[in-house]
């Protein structure tokens, strides 16, 4: 396989320059982004996925999976592995290493900071990922799998197939896999992701200070999955490479041991391809290729254009003596030789055994009469030269079985990291073991509460002395940690009472502990009186929010029932990966009018990002903010954005007063980011607000929604829309209901 890190969104400024140039040259009509490049984009909230899906709105992939013949699929995949095609011959007669790289690069874009990337959705099929330099030649791997996808149709997603192919390839080459979970559904259009600020491939403007990687990025250069295999910026320094590796893999939630296992295990298979200079031979990437190429790119005009003439990363050679078998040879070779720097035929920097040793060790991938020396990359030598990595590789050099187990677990984590909890795992290959990185929750060993119990609990909660604000804030804090990007967070597990979530500034830890103590008392009293039926704290927290909203709606003259579905359980601290869960902490949450000091992103932009992570649309975001303001759900208890004289009542007052022309808004003279709403005639301060409030009046799209909710005939509609959006957030992590 290729090295694991060989050599679309541009920044707004770069896009604008490019757009302006293109329009000047071609006469294209300027769009809104051209005229107003700094306007708030609501694109992350557009729900166009259903309209883009040709399978129809009623298609359910999990249902379709029930008809998948997994054993037949595995058999077919194993046949593909050794059925070498003339248009793209298999190295060593086996496509397994090629498919491992395919699977790795499908999953390896995942980054822990915002949960974006990963294999779910099959995004490698679309730009920009299909044309990243790091993904060169993987278009051919997908075409090799196309007959499999055609045969199994809707019962097998591309997302699952892209990951399964490499996993079965490893198994077919003698590696004992942990297992595999189906359940990744396909998207039908590319996700808009900020992959970096650079305007050119393989460039780097994402580091600061002592080569600290900017957030939220995981890769070190534009168009890479992880790091430059030749070393940072092509500098063949293994220690410097180790720094980059640790950062990049750490951004994916991998420990040192997992990182070493993945690199050493992955490079046990296959080879790198650099038979010629890419600039002399290789054509445009798939997205830029001519129409007759039909979605294939990187056409190679040198020699055969494939096989022994293949050009992918520019690096050339294999690491082991048996590249199509699982062996211990990578680590053996790493320590058996002293390595000296050389260059590949393409001019890339790589390493070979010193003094011309072992030149007859590695078989050629296509010509049985030829043999070669093994290679190492600068990033491979980092596993020997970095002190921490060296301890690991030396231990595994002496214990091949431990190395095998470590790689199996790390591979499973790599390829399932963005799937969320085990409840989303489907199929007969799912392992029985669970891992802390899956954010597990216990299985309930008691009877769930019924309607009568719900009524009793609501009454007890409302009689507990907690305010509407207390209950709404706590329920929101518990559920709104959820991210649709990697299905982490949410109310299930009641992790709001555990580290690190209990200490997040946005959750106001002291107030939170006060509220949780009362709710735990309600839970304890109920469970004490019931033998078989129990309630979790996770359910009590969500139920408290529902009860408070129903009471607030009643105050406003609306009799409503907030949907509630019991079944959540309470996780333990041991079930919570504190270090990775910490990345879910919001530094800005416009729904609670919270913005951490020093956080650079504009509060309005951060609000849209938070809404996107929750899977909300623009109307849902608008309804929630308007409702949460009048219910006094601000994190710090401030009155910013509380545009009502009747706080605690679920009214449309936020919108009525926001669009009221008797108010004129001015920036505060004393506090940055704060605005004052003055009576237009008297000049008296009526309200205070942040940009997370006023954006609903200044942005034309959001104002249209706000004006709608301000109408006299929209009060009932607003209340119901708020409840619907609230319930969507409360049940976002309830995959058992979907």
UniProtKB/Swiss-Prot annotation:
Residues marked Transition state stabilizer (site): 101
Organism taxonomic ancestry: Bacteria, Pseudomonadati, Pseudomonadota, Gammaproteobacteria, Cellvibrionales
UniProt protein name: Catalase-peroxidase
Active-site positions on this chain: 105 (proton acceptor)
Cited PROSITE patterns: PEROXIDASE_1, PEROXIDASE_2, PEROXIDASE_4
Cross-link for Tryptophyl-tyrosyl-methioninium (Trp-Tyr) (with M-252), residue positions: 104-226
Record's cofactor remark: Binds 1 heme b (iron(II)-protoporphyrin IX) group per dimer.
Cross-link Tryptophyl-tyrosyl-methioninium (Tyr-Met) (with W-104) mapped to chain: 226-252
Modification after translation: Formation of the three residue Trp-Tyr-Met cross-link is important for the catalase, but not the peroxidase activity of the enzyme.
């Amino acid at each position: 396989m290729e090295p694991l890190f060989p050599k679309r969104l541009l920044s707004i400024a770069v896009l604008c320059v490019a757009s302006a140039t293109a329009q000047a040259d071609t006469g294209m009509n300027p769009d809104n982004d051209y005229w107003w490049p700094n306007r708030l984009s609501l694109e992350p909230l557009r729900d166009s996925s259903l309209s883009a899906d040709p399978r129809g709105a009623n298609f359910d992939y999990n249902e379709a999976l029930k008809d998948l013949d997994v054993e037949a699929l595995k058999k077919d995949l194993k046949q593909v592995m050794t059925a070498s095609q003339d248009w793209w011959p298999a190295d060593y007669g086996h496509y397994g290493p090629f498919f491992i790289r395919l699977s790795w690069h499908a999953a390896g874009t995942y980054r822990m900071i915002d949960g974006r990337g990963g294999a779910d959705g099959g995004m490698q099929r679309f730009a920009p990922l299909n044309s990243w330099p790091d993904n060169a030649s993987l278009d051919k791997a997908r075409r090799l799998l196309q007959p499999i996808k055609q045969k199994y149709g809707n019962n097998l997603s591309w997302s699952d197939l892209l990951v399964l192919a490499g996993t079965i390839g490893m198994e077919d080459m003698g590696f004992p896999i942990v297992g595999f979970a189906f359940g990744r559904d396909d998207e039908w259009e590319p996700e808009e992701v900020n992959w970096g600020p650079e305007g050119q491939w393989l460039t780097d403007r994402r580091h600061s200070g002592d080569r600290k990687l900017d957030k939220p990025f995981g890769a070190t250069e534009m168009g890479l999955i992880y790091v430059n295999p030749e070393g940072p910026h092509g500098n063949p320094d293994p220690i410097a490479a180790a720094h980059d590796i640790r950062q990049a893999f750490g951004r994916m939630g991998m420990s040192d041991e997992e990182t070493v296992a993945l690199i050493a295990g992955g490079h046990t298979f296959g080879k790198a391809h650099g038979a010629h200079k890419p600039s002399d031979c290789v054509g445009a990437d798939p997205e830029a290729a001519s129409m007759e190429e039909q979605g294939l790119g990187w056409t190679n005009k040198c020699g055969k254009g494939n096989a022994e003439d293949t050009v992918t990363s520019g690096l050339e050679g294999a690491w082991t003596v048996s590249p199509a078998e699982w062996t211990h040879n990578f680590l053996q070779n790493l320590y058996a030789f002293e390595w000296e720097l050389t260059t590949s035929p393409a001019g890339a920097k790589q390493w070979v055994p010193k003094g011309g040793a072992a030149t007859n060790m590695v078989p050629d991938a296509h010509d049985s009469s030829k043999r070669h020396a093994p290679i190492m990359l600068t990033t491979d030598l980092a596993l020997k030269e970095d002190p921490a990595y060296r301890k690991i590789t030396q231990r595994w050099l002496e214990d091949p079985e431990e190395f095998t187990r470590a790689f199996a677990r790390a591979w499973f984590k790599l390829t399932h990291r963005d799937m969320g909890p085990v409840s989303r795992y489907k199929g007969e290959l799912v392992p029985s073991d669970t891992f802390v990185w899956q954010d597990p929750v216990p299985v309930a060993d008691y009877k769930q509460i019924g309607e009568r119990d719900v009524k009793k609990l609501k009454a007890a909660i409302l009689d507990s002395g907690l305010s509407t604000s207390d209950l709404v804030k706590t329920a929101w804090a518990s559920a709104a940690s959820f991210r649709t990007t990697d299905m982490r967070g949410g109310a299930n597990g009641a992790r709001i009472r555990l580290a690190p979530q209990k200490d997040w500034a946005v959750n106001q830890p002291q107030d939170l502990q006060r509220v949780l103590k009362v709710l735990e008392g309600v839970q304890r009293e109920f469970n004490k009186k019931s033998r078989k039926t129990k309630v979790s704290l996770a359910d009590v927290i969500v139920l408290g929010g529902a009860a408070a909203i129903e009471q607030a709606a009643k105050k406003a003259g609306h009799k409503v029932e907030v949907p509630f579905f019991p079944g959540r359980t309470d996780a333990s601290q041991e079930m919570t990966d504190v270090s990775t869960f910490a990345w879910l902490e919001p530094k800005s949450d416009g729904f609670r009018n919270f913005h951490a000091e020093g956080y650079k992103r504009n509060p309005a932009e951060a609000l849209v990002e938070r809404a996107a992570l929750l899977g909300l649309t623009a109307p849902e975001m608008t309804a929630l903010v308007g409702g949460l303001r009048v219910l006094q759900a601000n994190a710090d208890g401030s009155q910013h954005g509380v545009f009502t004289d009747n706080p605690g009542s679920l009214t449309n007052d936020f919108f009525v007063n926001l669009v009221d022309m008797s108010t004129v808004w001015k920036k505060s003279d004393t506090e940055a980011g704060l605005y004052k709403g003055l009576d237009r005639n008297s000049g008296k301060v009526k309200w205070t607000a942040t940009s997370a409030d006023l954006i609903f009046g200044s942005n034309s799209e959001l104002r249209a929604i706000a004006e709608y909710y301000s109408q006299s005939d929209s009060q009932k509609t607003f209340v119901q829309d708020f409840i619907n959006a609230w319930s969507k957030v409360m049940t976002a992590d309830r995959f058992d209901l979907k």
